[in-house]
């Protein structure tokens, strides 16, 4: 069922969501609030789904805003969401991140990727959620290759991933000279460990990492 919601922390920005697909959650919100984008930037959102992170990026009025996804139904909703909020200079492209290359290198890549290695039985036969949450068809290595292929030198990637797999991320990012410059761990108020971590990396940058104060999520 399609419903009309608003972007977390931005009640003036509305977004259509489909209960059968991946909907906005705290991961979306914390990554959206983590972004820094400039007006001259070309921004690429890999796996845009219904365009929530594109809407966050649009608040900075970038020169060009591109979202790609392999889910045509999600792209249709993303188009409605861009039009609903009068977003300018946007493009939505049906494409597979395993091979996608934009017609120019970009300044910023945004990515809230599928980060589970194996599908959950709870998803049943929901192909939309399987694509959004599990990396069967888009491995972590392929994700990093897609970022590297499209990001200019000194360009920035904003990324969110499972904390338990941080070593994998660091190894793969370093192999492509995507140097992690900032991290912020996200905690549930009721847990003693972090489930996800926000990452800012810069292609070809010098070493130097800042770990910011964590985000504590209270779901009440």
Across the structure, where does each feature detected by a protein language model lie?
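SAM-dependent Rossmann-like transferase core, predominantly class I methyltransferases
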Residues: 2-42, 48-60, 197-200, 204, ...
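Short, well-ordered coil/turn elements that cap or connect secondary structure elements
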Residues: 10, 38, 60-62, 87, ...
């Amino acid at each position: 069922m399609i419903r009309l919601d608003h972007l977390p922390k931005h009640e003036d920005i509305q977004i259509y969501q489909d209960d059968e697909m991946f909907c906005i959650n705290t991961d979306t919100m914390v990554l959206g609030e983590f972004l820094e984008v400039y007006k001259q930037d070309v921004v690429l959102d890999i796996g845009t789904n219904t365009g929530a992170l594109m809407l966050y990026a649009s608040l900075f009025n970038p020169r060009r805003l591109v979202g790609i996804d392999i889910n045509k139904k999600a792209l249709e909703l993303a188009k409605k969401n861009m039009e609903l909020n009068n977003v300018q200079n946007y493009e939505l492209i049906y494409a597979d991140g395993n091979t996608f290359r934009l017609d120019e290198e970009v300044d910023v890549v945004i990515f809230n990727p599928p980060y589970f290695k194996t599908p959950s039985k709870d998803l049943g036969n929901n192909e939309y959620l399987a694509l959004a949450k599990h990396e069967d068809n888009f491995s972590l290595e392929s994700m990093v290759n897609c970022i590297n292929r499209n990001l200019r030198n000194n360009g920035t990637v904003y990324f969110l991933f499972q904390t338990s797999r941080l070593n994998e991320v660091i190894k793969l990012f370093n192999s492509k000279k995507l140097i992690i410059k900032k991290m912020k761990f996200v905690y549930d108020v009721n847990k003693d460990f972090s489930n996800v971590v926000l990452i800012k990396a810069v292609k070809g940058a010098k070493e130097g990492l800042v770990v910011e104060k964590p985000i504590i999520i209270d779901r009440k």
